[in-house]
Amino acid sequence: LTPEGTFLDDMIVYRMAPIHFLLVVNAGNLAKDYAWVSEQVKATGDAVAIDSSSRYALIAIQGPASREVLQPLTGVELADIAPFWFSHGEVANARATVARTGYTGEDGYEIFIPPNMADRVWQAILESGRSADVVPAGLGARDTLRLEASMRLYGNDIDESTTVLEAGLGWIIG
């Protein structure tokens, strides 16, 4: 949030280690968000911001069958990952961070993998999900689900002129 209580963006922050954080931002705002974060950490004098976006591909599997489809592909015990938490391991023999997050309002997982492994993991998920009728879904489907779940999208539903209260998200202020 800005000092005025409006939105800079909508992001998820993962604490990977005591002094190592991974920020997952709206891809369309990457440059703006990176500039803002860099400014904030520079002001502290004891932190560094690194744009590591090219080191990750992200694949999301969402919905009631997500655990059933993903579990055979990983040694990570998916049931043990609490919502908005993550675990490190492998998915389809690719080094991965598996987070129990998503942008659909459904239970599901986001898988962070090296970009050169994305096709392998994607194909493995589709194969594992065949019996559960898993099919790829695009942004239109995601937008329908996020709207039904009252999840806001920066640039569509919220922007730098929208306050938290106007967006109906007063619960995020602590």
PLM regions: where:
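Acidic, proline/glycine-enriched N-terminal capping motif
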Residues: 1, 6-8, 140
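Short active-site-adjacent helix-start/loop capping segments
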Residues: 8-9, 32
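Glycine-rich, Trp-frequent "lid" loop and neighboring beta-strands that shape
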Residues: 12
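Conserved, structured C-terminal
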Residues: 16-174
